[in-house]
Design a protein with these regions (language model features):
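Feature captures the FAD/FMN-dependent oxidoreductase FAD-binding
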Residues: 74, 137, 142-146, 194-244, ...
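Residue-level detector of alpha-helix initiation sites
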Residues: 84, 149-151, 174, 288-290, ...
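N-terminal Rossmann-like FAD-binding beta1-loop-alpha1 element of flavoenzymes
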Residues: 141-167, 291-299
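FAD-site-proximal beta/loop scaffold in flavoenzymes
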Residues: 248-279, 364-438
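A conserved FAD-binding loop/helix module that cradles the flavin
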Residues: 294, 434-461
């Protein structure tokens, strides 16, 4: 009989007053007993709506049934038949809007905790299994992947399993893309990402780091090296700013730069070459997951006061509810219905104040959210010594501007065939944030799978 409890088995977590001073993972993971208990909440319904919410088509009820039976390795095999990054997805996917958002159990009570179960299965496999990956027999066909983020890693893995000789060209010195430079250690430990990359390498995938495509090599030069197809999964790393006075002051960062310095380049250690200046009062402008990551990172780096400055209300925050909840628990101060209009510097050129205006919400705009409007005469100043702009990102134009015939839309996103993900260049495919603009890890992975299938169909003819 299914477990008809209306609530999920709680996830063990670090105490907020302890974790806000360290970079260790916040969520500690289920035990075997917890996972099996939660798995019994799945009623294995006939239509399986949860699967329609998964961009990589994980056979969710099947793997959960194996967890309930204690057959964790069988569950892992089911998950990894379609998802090459289960330990990542179990931690950072917005399940509440995807698989769990469609779970029948959520109609009355809480949905089954699909993400936590996926994480448990992946972590159990890492802890208890020997690496028994079998490298597929090569078909002799070379395929290049640009970018070692979620889209590129997924595309590479799917093609490698089919026997293709895949080389990933990664601009940074570590593979993982946003998984290593954008998402903090306390949400996604880098050892997890490294293990997933090693799993790909065991399949025969080669990873070339420090390869900025468009500078070191062009797409045309890659094709001349004998690669029969190229997948561009270069992400969206070009940050947006407000265009207000003072954004060039010392102490003003994009969230992208701030998190990259902290996550990838260990800027919190004094002996590294890319330090983040010490901060007392930090303001993060924006309300998405990246803003929460930046704010929570600033707190861990020693800031006394960290503010989220957002022009709409708490109900309109685009960040995951779990991330907002964790930020509040840790002491982040939310200044909603506020918007910066000017940054003010001291005599040394470092930001020292942020001038804001209060906002009120009017009628809904084209996105369906109520439009924020300035309350005249409501200006006030906030003492700050660091400002982090978390206003979204767009694709870097480097590849587009160095590749003839590669078309992009007005936002700089590559134009692709929706069915095949082929660009306007023959045998050049693209997916993930390079096509959609900044989106989720799992959507990028779905694009990587789609492109791999298209490349295989083309090259196997």
């Amino acid at each position: 009989m299914p477990n008809m409890s209306l609530t999920k088995v709680p996830m063990p977590e670090q105490d907020p007053n302890v974790r806000n001073k360290n970079f260790e993972e916040v969520a500690l993971g289920y035990t075997k007993e917890m996972a099996m208990e939660e798995a019994t909440r799945c009623i294995n319904c006939k239509n399986k709506p949860c699967m329609s919410g998964c961009p990589v088509c994980v056979r969710i009820p099947e793997f959960i049934a194996k967890v309930a039976a204690g057959e964790f390795e069988e569950a892992y095999k089911i998950i990894t038949s379609t998802n090459g990054l289960p330990a990542v997805c179990g931690r950072v996917c917005p399940q509440e809007n995807q698989c769990e958002g469609k779970c029948i159990r959520g109609i009355k009570g809480e949905p089954v905790s699909i993400g936590r179960l996926e994480r448990f299965v992946a972590d159990y496999h890492m802890a208890h299994s020997n690496d028994d990956t079998i490298k597929p027999e090569s078909n002799g066909i070379k395929v290049a992947v640009v970018g070692a983020g979620p889209a590129g890693l997924t595309c590479a893995g799917d093609l490698a399993k089919l026997g293709y000789e895949v080389t990933i060209f990664e601009a940074f010195h570590k593979a993982g893309g946003v998984l290593v430079y954008g998402i903090p250690e306390f949400r996604l430990p880098k050892a997890i990402v490294q293990k997933e990359v090693e799993n790909l390498e065991a399949l025969g995938v080669k990873v070339e780091t420090d390869m900025v495509i468009g500078r070191v090599l062009s797409i045309d030069e890659i094709m001349e090296m004998g690669f029969k197809a190229v997948f561009i999964g270069s992400g969206a790393g070009l940050p947006s700013f407000m265009g207000i006075e003072g954004e060039a002051l010392v102490g003003v960062y994009s969230a992208n730069e701030y998190l990259t310095r902290a996550n990838l380049m260990k800027a919190y250690l004094d002996d590294y070459d890319t330090p983040i200046i010490k901060s007392k009062n930090v303001a993060v402008v924006g309300g998405g997951n990246v803003a929460m990551d930046a704010a929570r990172t600033a707190l861990r780096l020693g800031a006394e006061n960290v503010y989220i400055v957002y022009r709409r209300g708490m109900e309109e925050l685009p960040a995951r509810g779990e991330e907002v909840h964790h930020a509040i628990e840790e002491g982040i101060i939310f200044k909603t219905l506020n918007n910066p209009v000017k940054l003010i510097g001291d005599e040394d050129g470092r930001v020292c104040k942020m001038e804001c205006v209060e906002m009120e919400l009017g009628e809904p705009d084209s996105s369906g959210r109520r439009r924020p409007m300035v309350i005249e005469g409501s200006n006030f100043q906030l003492d700050v010594d660091t400002v982090i702009m978390s206003l979204g990102t767009s694709p870097n134009p480097l590849i587009r501007t160095t590749t003839k015939g590669l078309e992009a839309n007005k936002w700089g996103c590559l134009v692709v065939n929706e069915d095949t993900l082929e660009t306007t260049r023959d045998n050049v495919y693209a997916g993930g944030d390079a096509v959609t603009g900044a989106a989720t890890v799992i959507l990028a992975m779905g694009a990587g799978k789609q492109a791999a299938a298209s490349i295989h169909e083309r090259l196997s003819k």
